[in-house]
Amino acid sequence: MSKLKVTNARRKQRVRLSLRRTANGRPRLSVFRSSKHIYAQVIDDLKGETLASASSLEKTMRDAGNTGANIDAAKAVGKLLAERAVKNGVKEVVFDRGSYLYHGRVKALADAARESGLSF
């Protein structure tokens, strides 16, 4: 395993451990980004189910022109995810950035989710 993969795996493990300690039963907003798309979901770890999800692959995103891996698509995904989560009764979450730094697309998604009604 390369040094970069080891570093990312350790960072991801460290972030998830700190989230478990501070979650207090709140669902987790998990983010995954690839080179072409961005995905986000709100997960209830106690029940083991996904409460809301959104990605840049969805038809509504493609019709709006927000496809791909740019900051505008991340903002649209964050807004859509927050709307779906609030509709399902979720208002407070913990933000799980995984091994990604809080910068760029990850930060844009988080800010859009906050503006649309989620608090973390």
Curated annotation (Swiss-Prot):
The keyword RNA-binding is assigned to this record: yes
GO molecular function: 5S rRNA binding; structural constituent of ribosome
Keywords recorded for this protein, A-Z: Ribonucleoprotein, Ribosomal protein, RNA-binding, rRNA-binding
One GO term describing the cellular component: cytosolic large ribosomal subunit
Keyword Lipid metabolism belongs to the record: no
GO BP annotations, alphabetical order: translation
Domain of life: Bacteria
InterPro entries reported for this sequence: Ribosomal_uL18_bac-type, Ribosomal_uL18_bac/euk
One Pfam family, short name: Ribosomal_L18p
Annotated Gene3D superfamilies: 3.30.420.100
Role this protein plays: This is one of the proteins that bind and probably mediate the attachment of the 5S RNA into the large ribosomal subunit, where it forms part of the central protuberance.
Family: Belongs to the universal ribosomal protein uL18 family.
Database matches in NCBIfam families: L18_bact
Alphabetical list of HAMAP family matching this protein: Ribosomal_uL18_B
Subunit: Part of the 50S ribosomal subunit; part of the 5S rRNA/L5/L18/L25 subcomplex. Contacts the 5S and 23S rRNAs.
Official protein name in the record: Large ribosomal subunit protein uL18
The species this protein was found in: Nitrobacter hamburgensis (strain DSM 10229 / NCIMB 13809 / X14)
Lineage, highest ranks first: Bacteria, Pseudomonadati, Pseudomonadota, Alphaproteobacteria, Hyphomicrobiales
Gene encoding the protein: rplR
